[in-house]
Amino acid sequence: MKKLWGGRFTKTAAQWVDDFGASIHFDQQLVEEDIEGSIAHVTMLGECGILPKEDVETIKKGLTKLLEKAKRGELSFSVTYEDIHLNIEKMLIDEIGPVGGKLHTGRSRNDQVATDMHLYLRKRVIEIIELIRQLQRVLVEKAEQHIETLIPGYTHLQRAQPISFAHHLMAYVWMFERDRERFAESLKRMNKSPLGAGALAGTTFPIDRHLTARLLGFDGIYENSLDAVSDRDFIIEFLSNSSILMMHLSRFCEELILWSSQEFQFIEMDDTFATGSSIMPQKKNPDMAELIRGKTGRVYGHLMALLTVMKGLPLAYNKDMQEDKEGMFDTVQTVIGSLNIFAGMIETMTIRTDVMEKATKQDFSNATELADYLAKKGVPFREAHEIVGKLVLTCIERGVFLADLPLHVYQQASPLFEEDIYEALNPYTAVNRRTSAGGTGFTEVKKAIEKAKQMIEA
């Protein structure tokens, strides 16, 4: 079958060559954006007097009909026409006749596809920003319920200091806030129109790029036609932002996986987000958390792949750039799916507060309180650290915890220890005394929650 661009050629490609070069099996996801961009383009051609008004109206009616069919999932695509752009153009010509061939006046597939991807990604980034906001709401609500629930805080996955469980949850609220900010900031750079840049050098037609930009909701245009069609940094930035977001989700998933194990038993996943074993009847596996953790690697891979594709390309467009889409589409699907699943896991998980709090009393995570106790009485912190370290060793040798040591043992270590040391060792006291800004003290956590509420809804 003759190609729409086939005038210069004397031979047709073999089917297997067409199959290798075609992108329609994945770029059909741009169908709505492609038609929307074409409607704006032909509207501009009419406003600028480049096409007769009657032709413009005929083309717009044909495109509108195709858009309605696309939204209903009624369009069928062919590898013969390679990509979404030529498929739509062929459908338009079939729908309204040869006048449909005028649509591409003053436009190249190079600026067309760049426009499609800007429109597509803008919609998805806005959706992702809202999903992050919704996840933050879930975390803040859960944190409000557990301000005075204690949990061991860890470094090196070793118990370090007791903290408020709400404080732990709020740490992720702030991480996700930075993720949300990154996506929002990327929108400002992304929301520029490449339409009208042509293949690379602009066009001889008296087009109005600012008009099409306004019609499509862009804030402005790419100021350089070569830049407009040559770069995919807006996709790379999206993949980078997605990678950081997925890293945060993956870290939290790792904790949920650990906490739901028999070794921790801090939480239990809702049945909705767990699976069983085909051989072991007792198993309840945190598969959804594991999948998010695993899918993070896919997103990283897409980022590295596109960076690698782009790193050696001379300006302007090269067919290598066709490889920008599948990773983008997959990342969009992965991020949106992960955010929805993760919010559901947090919302429905059972939190075993008794197990968490018991864990804060069966370790040496209150040792820092002893060192601080001595430091506040004038002992150099390094000396206090040494004294408390030896007391911990004494406990280990006796098989007890710090709160179990009699006062005379403390006073043998330092005469500055008094009866009030036992109150300092109480995990609730230890947590609540950490009132420095951003600390785990209950009053500070409450402040953080209120601040986060305002931030999320701003």
From Swiss-Prot:
Under what name is this protein listed? Answer: Argininosuccinate lyase
Family as reported in the entry's similarity comment:
Belongs to the lyase 1 family. Argininosuccinate lyase subfamily.
Reaction(s) catalysed (UniProt annotation): 2-(N(omega)-L-arginino)succinate = fumarate + L-arginine
Q: Which GO terms describe its molecular function?
A: argininosuccinate lyase activity
Biological-process GO terms, alphabetical = arginine biosynthetic process via ornithine; L-arginine biosynthetic process
Q: Which Pfam families match?
A: ASL_C2, Lyase_1
Upper lineage:
Bacteria, Bacillati, Bacillota, Bacilli, Bacillales
Keywords in alphabetical order, please: Amino-acid biosynthesis, Arginine biosynthesis, Cytoplasm, Lyase
PROSITE patterns on file: FUMARATE_LYASES (PS00163)
> Quick one: signal sequence residues?
none
**What cellular-component terms does GO give this entry?**
cytosol
The EC number on file is 4.3.2.1
The gene designation is argH
